[in-house]
Amino acid sequence: MNKTELIAKVAEKQGVSKKEGAPSVEKVFDTISEALKSGEKVSIPGFGTFEVRERAARKGRNPQTGEEIDIPATKAPAFKPAKALKDAVKAK
């Protein structure tokens, strides 16, 4: 399911048009993104937790030349599903 399909599904469940449902979905994504940018965790009970995780610096290899390179430390968004979500997926 892509973003457009998600908007259509949410709008259908709310009984509104896609045009009316789109801003709600957009605002949820924007709010989660802003929270992660500011270093906050976003926990949704029964669904999961979005957070930013630190990736340590490491050595890598250039696949074309085989030369060893340094890969700097970075931050990456991560999602940890809640037990209820895991159980719901397993039950299908």
From Swiss-Prot:
Domain of life: Bacteria
Region of interest (Disordered), residue spans: 55-77
GO CC annotations, alphabetized: cytosol
One annotated GO molecular function: structural constituent of chromatin
Keywords attached to this entry: DNA condensation, DNA-binding, Phosphoprotein
Residue list for modification Phosphothreonine: T4
Pfam families for the chain: Bac_DNA_binding
Gene Ontology BP annotations: chromosome condensation
DNA-binding keyword on record: yes
InterPro entries listed in its UniProt record: Hist_DNA-bd (IPR000119), Histone-like_DNA-bd_CS (IPR020816), IHF-like_DNA-bd_dom_sf (IPR010992)
Subunit organization: Homodimer.
Described purpose of this protein according to its UniProt entry: Histone-like DNA-binding protein which is capable of wrapping DNA to stabilize it, and thus to prevent its denaturation under extreme environmental conditions.
Similarity section: Belongs to the bacterial histone-like protein family.
Protein name (database record): SPbeta prophage-derived DNA-binding protein HU 2
